[in-house]
Every structure is written in C-alpha cells, then in structure tokens.
Amino acid sequence: EDGSGEFLAEGGGVR
C-alpha cells in the first residue's frame, strides 16, 4: 500500500 507519509507505518511506502 501507499504510506500516508511514513515508511513502515502501514507496511507501505513513502508515496
């Protein structure tokens, strides 16, 4: 998934 600003916040990215 695309992170909301974090990198490993939701296991997503920093997009």
Swiss-Prot record:
Annotated GO CC locations: extracellular region
Post-translational events: Conversion of fibrinogen to fibrin is triggered by thrombin, which cleaves fibrinopeptides A and B from alpha and beta chains, and thus exposes the N-terminal polymerization sites responsible for the formation of the soft clot. The soft clot is converted into the hard clot by factor XIIIA which catalyzes the epsilon-(gamma-glutamyl)lysine cross-linking between gamma chains (stronger) and between alpha chains (weaker) of different monomers.
Record flagged with keyword Secreted: yes
Chief location of this protein within or outside the cell: secreted
Keywords annotated in UniProt: Adaptive immunity, Blood coagulation, Coiled coil, Disulfide bond, Hemostasis, Immunity, Innate immunity, Secreted
Subcellular location: Secreted
GO biological process: adaptive immune response; blood coagulation; innate immune response
Domains (record comment): A long coiled coil structure formed by 3 polypeptide chains connects the central nodule to the C-terminal domains (distal nodules). The long C-terminal ends of the alpha chains fold back, contributing a fourth strand to the coiled coil structure.
Quaternary structure and interacting proteins, as annotated: Heterohexamer; disulfide linked. Contains 2 sets of 3 non-identical chains (alpha, beta and gamma). The 2 heterotrimers are in head to head conformation with the N-termini in a small central domain.
Function of the molecule: Cleaved by the protease thrombin to yield monomers which, together with fibrinogen beta (FGB) and fibrinogen gamma (FGG), polymerize to form an insoluble fibrin matrix. Fibrin has a major function in hemostasis as one of the primary components of blood clots. In addition, functions during the early stages of wound repair to stabilize the lesion and guide cell migration during re-epithelialization. Was originally thought to be essential for platelet aggregation, based on in vitro studies using anticoagulated blood.
Protein name as it appears in the record: Fibrinogen alpha chain
Organism: Syncerus caffer
